UniProtKB/Swiss-Prot annotation:
InterPro entries: Mitochondr_Som1 (IPR024645). It comes from the Eukaryota. Non-catalytic component of the mitochondrial inner membrane peptidase (IMP) complex. IMP catalyzes the removal of signal peptides required for the targeting of proteins from the mitochondrial matrix, across the inner membrane, into the inter-membrane space. SOM1 facilitates cleavage of a subset of IMP substrates. Keywords: Membrane, Mitochondrion, Mitochondrion inner membrane, Transit peptide. The gene is SOM1. Its main location: mitochondrion. One of its GO terms (cellular component) is mitochondrial inner membrane peptidase complex. Pfam families: Mitochondr_Som1 (PF11093). It is found in: Mitochondrion inner membrane. Coiled coil: none annotated. Present with 358 molecules/cell in log phase SD medium. It comes from Saccharomyces cerevisiae (strain ATCC 204508 / S288c) (Baker's yeast). This is Protein SOM1, mitochondrial. The keyword Transit peptide applies.
């Protein structure tokens, strides 16, 4: 099971992280999930991409922020 992930809006993700200092390391991570539907005698699957900002705080704790927006999968 995946760990809990904080969900933020696009605007929140683009704003400076007030709780973390300017020395914080952040990387963009991508997760692809598949949405499948059964049609007739076969499954039709489409990818759904989710983006996360993975940040390491000064105390070495890691936090993931979802930054997926409406344009990510268009």
């Amino acid at each position: 099971m995946a760990p809990p992930t904080t969900i933020r809006t696009r605007d929140q993700a683009l704003a400076p992280l007030a709780t973390l200092d300017s020395q914080t390391n952040c990387r963009l991570k991508e997760l692809v999930q598949w949405e499948c539907q059964f049609k007739g005698a076969e499954y039709v699957c489409s990818p759904f991409k989710r983006l996360f900002e993975h940040c390491i705080a000064p105390d070495k704790s890691a936090t993931n922020y979802e930054v997926t927006d409406t344009y990510t999968n268009s």
